[in-house]
Amino acid sequence: CGQCSKVCPYTAIISRKRPCENACKIKAITMNENKAAAIDNNTCISCGACVYQCPFGAITDKSYILNVIDMIKKSGDNEKYHVYAVIAPSISSQFTYAKLGQVVTGLHRLGFYSVAEAALGADMVADAESRELVEKGFLTSSCCPGFVSYIEKAFPELKPYISHNLSPMATIARYLKEHDATAKVVFIGPCTAKKGEAAKQEVRPYVDAAMTFEELQALFDSREIDITALEEGMLDEASYFGRIFARCGGLAEAVAQGIKEHGHTHFELKAT
């Protein structure tokens, strides 16, 4: 009757194609001679789609959670050095059961010295990219490491047009280290590709570790921290335009605002 094929979440009744293979839009995952899924690292952009779509947990990204715990413990309550948490703007949509200020307080309870918004780095990047766009006329963003990797691997002819600016994560981390010689920076966001970005030569001096929101929740759970019971901490450094980077079209809006503030009224922004 076909009812089983309709309800099987893995399409196992009518197809042997793995969920991870279906999830990979750039076709970096194929079946090897043993019918096992294999990832072509020359094509993979580390977007994490396969990780989230695999129902069996067979694919995992590298975790730095133990490195972060070790970093905090060895800081001696931030006496030897200061451990900063840089949080992505999308954190407000991840911890929907609590207020952002409560998450900030929770981060302090975990042992972080201070919490900074990646959105503040986004403000800096939007300002710089708006200038660069007007100068060059055509530009692709350097904010998303997965997108940058995709251009480099699939469209190498566009590589010269990638913005020369660091991402918001790296930009705010560099700012923190320029103003605090003892700073160690941990980025916390939704994207597994950020872990690969943190390991890049041009980013490594600024970002010491990167974690996902799921790993942050694991840290809260391990310390039995109920963030809904905490007071709200303050976090108000970034602008509206820096915070909307996380939504579709947010980067274009922020760059458009930067162009406007710099007085380039003659320049017409055509975002695609």
Where are these predicted regions, by residue range?
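Iron-sulfur cluster-binding cysteine motifs and their immediate structural context
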Residues: 2-45, 49-65
